[in-house]
Design a protein with these regions (language model features):
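Alpha-helical scaffold elements within enzyme catalytic domains, especially in hydrolases
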Residues: 1, 59, 119-120
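Mid-chain, structured segments of secreted extracytoplasmic proteins
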Residues: 1-2, 13
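Structural recognition of the beta-strand scaffold that forms the well-ordered cores
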Residues: 4-7, 43-46, 66-70, 100-104, ...
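Active-site beta-loop-alpha junctions enriched in small/polar residues
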Residues: 10, 48-50, 72-74, 105-107, ...
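Alpha-helical scaffold elements lining the catalytic groove of polysaccharide deacetylases
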Residues: 13-41, 51-98, 110-116
């Protein structure tokens, strides 16, 4: 399993605070930059702070991207910025359920907790899947 490169905007701005045109620029500039680097446009969009707007949803759809939001995450909270605490909460939170999409940032504590998180999830019977699998499952459920 490799990594899917998605669109998370150019500057991580709070989209509800931006005009429609500014939201469009945030989203399209990122897709263009990703395409210039890897040769393909992102297929998924995740709004900063999970704050989608009607405009951001429409812009993402026009660009052929699916929304890929998260279920829960803790690595941005100071009490979980150490590997043991982060691994414990990520595996034992009440928000863990079938289809959960875990929010994990590129931080040292997250890197250091990753193996424990994966092991803990697998021990509970969960499997790691790529974003395409999640998107396909959501489409099937909506039908």
């Amino acid at each position: 399993m490799g990594f899917e490169i998605g669109n998370h905007t150019e500057t991580h701005a709070s989209l509800p605070e931006l005009s429609v045109e500014a939201q469009r620029e945030e989203i399209t500039a990122t897709s263009e930059r990703v395409e210039a680097i890897i040769g393909e446009r992102p297929r998924f969009f995740r709004a900063p702070f999970g704050q989608n707007t009607e405009a951001s949803r429409e812009i993402a759809e026009e660009a052929g991207m699916e929304l890929m939001n998260w279920t829960y995450g803790y690595d941005w909270e100071s009490e979980y910025q150490n590997a043991p605490a982060l691994a414990d909460i990520m595996v034992n939170t009440e928000y863990l359920n079938h289809g959960a999409n875990l929010l994990m940032h590129d931080r040292a504590c997250t890197r250091d907790a990753s193996a424990q998180i994966v092991e803990g999830l697998r021990d509970k019977g969960y499997a790691l899947v790529d974003p395409e699998t999640i998107a396909s499952s959501e489409k099937e459920a909506a039908q």
